[in-house]
Each structure stands twice: as C-alpha cells, then as structure tokens.
Amino acid sequence: MEAIFCGVGEAFDKHLSNTSILVVDDSQGSRRQVLLDCGFSAPGPFWCHALDPSALDAVWISHFHGDHFLGLPQLMLRLFEEGRRQPLTIVCQTGGGATIKAAMQLAYPGFSEKLTY
C-alpha cells in the first residue's frame, strides 16, 4: 500500500494545497485507488500525482467543510470530460448525498444530470 500526499496544507494555506491523500493498494493483485478528502484545491495536485486518474475507485469525504469536499465537482467534471464511464464510489457521512448534489448544482448547474457514472 502506498500513500501519495496530494496536499498537506490547511484551508487557507497560501503555499500548500488542502490535505488530500491518494491511497493506492496493489496487495490483492489488482490496483485500487481511494482519494481521502477532496477540498477545493485538491483536484489539480491529484491529477499531477495520480498514476492513472481514470482508475480512481472511490473518494472518502471525512466531513463537509469546503476544504474537505468542495473539489469534488471539479474532479467529477474532469473525469467525465476524459470519458469515465465506470461508477465512482463516494463514501461520506449519512445524508451527505444531498450535500454533494447541492455542491454539484452550484458549481456546474445541470452537470449531475449528464453524469454517466
């Protein structure tokens, strides 16, 4: 298992992007990738550090502060633009689906209806 730090800063750090960690596990003979948190500054570093961004299996959201989840709309849009079709699992607290849908609608109105994954 490998942990790739895509960011180690806090919400208002002017030098480092939000804390976000890409966990890559090859132990079962197939690669699994999980992104731990996806704050507003996390998508760019994720694309720089991920070996295969389209192979992302899941995103785990620790809690619903902007610096932990507001990068999700950008991440999902980019995956869509690059042709992603397989499902993306999002793990979050109970009731978080409505919060994510609201963020998607605010960031890119109508986009979530176009998602094919």
PLM region spans:
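Binuclear metal-dependent hydrolase catalytic cores
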Residues: M1-Y117
